[in-house]
Structures are given as C-alpha cells and as structure tokens.
Amino acid sequence: MIQIGDTIISLDIFEKKFCCDLAVCKGICCVEGDSGAPLEEGEAEQIRENYRKIKPYMKPEGIAAVEEQGFSVVDIEGDMVTPLIEGRECAYIIEENGCSWCAIEKAWSRGESSFRKPISCHMYPIRVKQYQNYEAMNYDQWTICACARLKGEQEGIPVYVFLKDALIRKYGEEWYEQLCYAAREIETGKIKFGR
C-alpha cells in the first residue's frame, strides 16, 4: 500500500493493467451488478439539478424507474446508489450502436449538463471505501471486465494511467502528480515491498 495524503492506495492500482474495450463488452457494467452505481455525497443532488437535460436521453423504462424510486436509492448495504430498472440495469442507461452507456454522461458530453457521471463509474475498476481517518482505494476485478484487463495488458496501460481524468477529477492535479511519482519510484525499485 502507498499513502498519499489521507488516501491509502493498493499496489494493484500501479501494477495491474486495464483499458475498457467497449467494442467487446458492450457496456455490460451498466447492466450487471447487485445494485446501482454508488453515489458520493451530493451526487444525487447534482443528478436532480441536471435531470431536465439528462431525461431526453433516457429510456422510457429508466424515466419510469426514476419517477417511481427517485434520483437515487439506498441499497441493501445502506449505500446511496442509482435506481435500477426492474432490479437489473441502471435507470440512466442508454443503448446506442449495440452498446450501453450513460444518459448522464451523454448530456454532459453535449455541454448540456454540469455533472459528468457518478465518480464511482468514472473511476472503475477502482473502488473507494471511506473510513474514519482515510480512504482506501482498491482494484476491483469483475469477471465481466476480462476484455479490459486483456486490452490493458496488450497496450501496457496501468489502472492509474487509464483512470487519469477520473483521479484528477476526484483528487486534483497535485495528488495525481504524487501518484505518478510513487509509480515511478515503484517501477525503478526505489520503493520496495516485502511480498
């Protein structure tokens, strides 16, 4: 583990390779799972504030799910998440050209919304767990992302490089520069770990 500020980072984030391969997976991460996308404090409010711009891109079933359940729900583990359509796919899912992706992000990409998408989606395959005095960042290895691991290996893209924009969005440029410095120190052997 590496610590930067109040963030504890798993070595897998430096060592594992990952690069989404939408042509292969078709955005299945928006469909599969036990609950909706985890939401950080304030994200449900950002969805609500931008909903008028997001809604035109949503499927009718997604709109119905939001109208019935709300912009967010609390899952079985007590976490705030996006609502689901019939307990399966995210209410904010859209399908284009045979791929699933996010109505929230589509509105943002067109300059119509100020909210890009939940940071938990943007940062996947990193999952962040909040503790009293720190955050723990771990690499999540979901079976449906096997193609992303393969593509990441083939292209030599570490998780932290693939997620540069998301990590900067959450933690800032200076934090990301420190992360890259730690990665170089690990790579050159200046930081060693007993394994």
Sequence positions of predicted segments:
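Short loop/turn segments that flank or connect secondary-structure elements
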Residues: M1-R195
